[in-house]
Amino acid sequence: NGRVYTCLEQLREQADEELFLFLEEWFDDRSYVLGHTSGSTGAPKEIQLSKADMRASARMTNAFFAIDRESVLLLCLSVSYIAGKMMVVRALEAGAELLTVKVSSHPLRITGQEEYVDRRIDLAAMVPMQVEESMKSESEKQRFGYIRHLMIGGAPVSVALEERLKKIPTQCYATYGMTETVSHIALKKLNSDPAYFALGEVGFEQDERGCLIINAPHLQARRFV
């Protein structure tokens, strides 16, 4: 939010506790952070997320969206979940500015969040509910014009919402991925493209049972079924 910190202790008094605890975990000596599976293949369970994998995923996304040290990223999702964690890691990897706001159904509401005023945002991520609620307010809807790229994930994007997104200047992308693949591995441009496309060297195939196989060479596991 326009501030520079040289150590975690400086951040303790300014940052949300949840964010501080994640950064404390990120900069500790372990090679992983704790997360929870998406629940798409069974009951959610605690897993270890490789920091190396998270960095690789962040670099892949940053390369696609041309994120660098001059960029501004918006964090409006909980860092308890992979989407929030990864936005922080993308900012760290790029040396970009991270604009943090209170997690709510109205992330573009300026009241109490004056750091938003006239800020250009290069990349943001929201769940469909946040986008839908923001579109109901004319002032919040106008603020989408300040966001260059918006990733929408965590739940399906309805046809009605997709149609509304075609009327704003923001380049909007639906995401495909899960905690196990360390955030998204494919995107669909909602304003135009009808199909998902894989990022980087990610590839998809089916096994003899018809199950989806994800080949992700940038991750240590490389293959997910």
Can you annotate each of these PLM segments?
Residues 137-192:
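Gly/Ser/Thr-rich phosphate-binding loop
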